[in-house]
């Protein structure tokens, strides 16, 4: 009976917390698609592709190492352009910070290389640097690389990864859409092959210029590709867009891409395309 009149406790015992595991930073990488936790080393050995098919972004040098013959890449010197043409506040400090963090001069790396002995000019954008945005340096580097390819009679393979035009450079940035397009037009008139390889993300002014001007336009699986953002389009047209809108697969279904190529097939695909076009020279 005494237990019946006994006052109940107003608290509950707390479960003892499990000790926190002090894992080294960068040891594990979580897939944003399937949420699986990978050992970063194993993920890198798998060319940063998850078992679910998600393609993690590659750094410019990682993609070059995976693509071209070992020791064949000859990097072109960067163009001489004014770093801050509009004197935008803090812009130069941000560029310096990105250079230290990424180890590259700007958001694109261009050079001459070979794939199984087949010569080509390759340009790779790196979204770690200012989100791969296109300013005067990026535009002129790509245009100069394309002009070099034209003079040497070589095909061009360009990997895009960009948030679009660089806002800190205003009209100077937008001019690069025309600059790169003109260089590619001259390359095309010389009867040479240009393959645009779109990776995640390819948006804005880049998607509206050289990213979609290839003789072959291909993309990695799941890549976000588009000009304006999804929300802006939905607000403008006042309609709900499909779930897979602006993905590589959606563009392929719509006829805006020629193929969606898994990263493991990238090198063999490009080799085959260059061989099919007589080493990148198209007969006109």
UniProtKB/Swiss-Prot annotation:
> Which UniProt keyword terms apply here?
ATP-binding, Cytoplasm, Fatty acid biosynthesis, Fatty acid metabolism, Lipid biosynthesis, Lipid metabolism, Metal-binding, Nucleotide-binding, Transferase, Zinc, Zinc-finger
Chemical reaction(s) catalysed? N(6)-carboxybiotinyl-L-lysyl-[protein] + acetyl-CoA = N(6)-biotinyl-L-lysyl-[protein] + malonyl-CoA
Zinc finger spans (C4-type) are 31-52
Known EC number(s)? 2.1.3.15
User: Which cofactors, if any, are listed as required?
Assistant: Zn(2+)
Q: Where does Zn(2+) bind?
A: 31, 34, 50, 52
Q: List the disulfide bonds.
A: none
Q: Which GO terms describe its molecular function?
A: acetyl-CoA carboxylase activity; ATP binding; carboxyl- or carbamoyltransferase activity; zinc ion binding
Q: In which pathway does it act?
A: Lipid metabolism; malonyl-CoA biosynthesis; malonyl-CoA from acetyl-CoA: step 1/1
Q: Which residues form the CoA carboxyltransferase N-terminal domain?
A: 27-284
Q: Does the keyword Endoplasmic reticulum apply?
A: no
Query: Pfam families, alphabetically?
Result: Carboxyl_trans (PF01039)
Q: How are cofactors bound according to the entry's free-text note?
A: Binds 1 zinc ion per subunit.
* UniProt keyword annotation of Cytoplasm present: yes
* GO terms under cellular component: acetyl-CoA carboxylase complex
Q: Where in the cell is it found?
A: Cytoplasm
Principal location:
cytoplasm
Instruction: Give the SUPFAM superfamilies listed for this entry.
Output: ClpP/crotonase (SSF52096)
Q: Which GO terms describe its biological process?
A: fatty acid biosynthetic process; malonyl-CoA biosynthetic process
UniProt subunit comment: Acetyl-CoA carboxylase is a heterohexamer composed of biotin carboxyl carrier protein (AccB), biotin carboxylase (AccC) and two subunits each of ACCase subunit alpha (AccA) and ACCase subunit beta (AccD).
**Belongs to which family?**
Belongs to the AccD/PCCB family.
Entry's HAMAP family?
A: AcetylCoA_CT_beta
Q: What does this protein do?
A: Component of the acetyl coenzyme A carboxylase (ACC) complex. Biotin carboxylase (BC) catalyzes the carboxylation of biotin on its carrier protein (BCCP) and then the CO(2) group is transferred by the transcarboxylase to acetyl-CoA to form malonyl-CoA.
What name is this protein filed under? Acetyl-coenzyme A carboxylase carboxyl transferase subunit beta
**Protein source organism:** Exiguobacterium sp. (strain ATCC BAA-1283 / AT1b)
Task: Identify the gene encoding this protein.
Answer: accD
């Amino acid at each position: 009976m005494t237990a019946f009149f006994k006052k109940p406790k107003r608290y509950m015992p707390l479960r003892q917390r499990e000790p926190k595991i002090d894992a080294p930073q960068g040891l594990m990488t979580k897939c944003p698609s399937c949420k699986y936790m990978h050992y970063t080393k194993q993920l890198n050995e798998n060319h940063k592709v998850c078992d679910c098919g998600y393609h993690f972004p590659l750094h410019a040098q990682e993609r070059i190492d995976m693509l071209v013959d070992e020791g064949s890449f000859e990097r072109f010197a960067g163009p001489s352009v004014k770093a801050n043409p509009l004197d935008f506040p803090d812009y130069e400090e941000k560029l310096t910070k990105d250079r230290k963090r990424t180890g590259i001069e700007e958001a694109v790396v261009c050079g001459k290389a070979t794939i199984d002995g087949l010569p080509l000019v390759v340009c790779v954008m790196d979204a770690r640097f200012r989100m791969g945005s296109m300013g005067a340096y990026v535009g002129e580097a790509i245009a100069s690389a394309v002009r070099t390819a034209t003079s040497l009679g070589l095909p061009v393979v360009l990997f895009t990864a960009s948030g679009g035009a660089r806002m800190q450079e205003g009209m100077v940035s937008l001019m690069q859409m025309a600059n790169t397009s003109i260089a590619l037009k001259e390359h095309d008139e010389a009867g040479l092959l240009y393959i645009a390889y779109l990776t995640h993300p390819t948006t804005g002014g880049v998607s509206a210029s050289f990213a979609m001007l290839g003789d072959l336009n291909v993309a990695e699986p799941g890549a976000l590709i588009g000009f304006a953002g999804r929300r802006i389009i939905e607000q403008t047209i006042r309609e709900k867009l499909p779930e897979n809108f602006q993905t590589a697969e959606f563009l392929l279904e719509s006829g805006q891409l020629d193929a969606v190529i898994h990263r493991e097939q990238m090198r063999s695909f490009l080799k085959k395309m260059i061989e099919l076009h007589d080493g990148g020279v198209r007969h006109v």
